[in-house]
Amino acid sequence: MKILILDDEMFARQELSFLVEHSQEVDNPEIFQAEDISEAEKILFRQQIDLIFLDISLSEENGFTLANQLSQLAHPPLVVFATAYDNYAVKAFESNAVDYIMKPFEQQRVDMALSKVKKLSQLTTASDVEQAIPKKASVELLTLTLSDRSVVVKMQDIVAASVEDGELTVSTVQKTYTIRKTLNWFKSRAVAPYFLQIHRNTVINLEMIEEIQPWFNHTLLLIMSNGEKFPVGRSYLKDLNEHLTM
């Protein structure tokens, strides 16, 4: 797979290149780097790039400028936006991006993006790929209002939501946010069948379960992909078993 990383910061390019090279999702990736759109265009002209990691805020340019030009190529690459800003998510998916990852980059999150790219690259026609890429209408986003700002997170990136002492903690694959909301508020926005309540104060993303262990009183302990651990309440065991093949 030929991958182009466009970022005006050399450290960010090197960091992302390192994570891609060490990912289990791609074999022997051929990685190209560019610090501006002009340099990226030269690489795109010479190479048939399969994937571009695209920063949004470049020194004097905007990554969306290049993203909008890619559709003119005979074989446009898939796009993953890689940025320090969390307020461009909706616009990113409007431009048919496969994923949207945040700085500082983490191996697990890069792996998730590459896994999506790998699945899309196995599709045979352009129309298949276009239908598989999330569109604005189908991308589930959740706005979390913090004390100093609001952040937008993708529901699929949420690991769990739990309530303690009147505060709701929402854990994603990258960060944890605490807001003044109830668990019912989150449940009303969580999309089935991915989210399931496993305790009176906890809802988890089923796709983020990494390991299941026996627990006290014939219950279970869920180990999530980000390392968090959540006990399953006895009254929720039946519902969990119905959603999992055990």
Swiss-Prot record:
Chain positions with 4-aspartylphosphate modification: D55
Domain Response regulatory as annotated: residue spans: 2-118
Pfam families: LytTR, Response_reg
Keywords noted in UniProt: Cytoplasm, DNA-binding, Phosphoprotein, Transcription, Transcription regulation, Two-component regulatory system
InterPro entries xrefs: CheY-like_superfamily (IPR011006), LytR-like (IPR046947), LytTR_DNA-bd_dom (IPR007492), Sig_transdc_resp-reg_receiver (IPR001789)
Repressor listed as a keyword: no
Gene Ontology terms: cellular component: cytoplasm
PTM characteristics: Phosphorylated by LytS.
Protein purpose: Member of the two-component regulatory system LytR/LytS that probably regulates genes involved in cell wall metabolism.
Protein name (record): Sensory transduction protein LytR
Natural source organism: Streptococcus agalactiae serotype V (strain ATCC BAA-611 / 2603 V/R)
Gene name for this UniProt entry: lytR
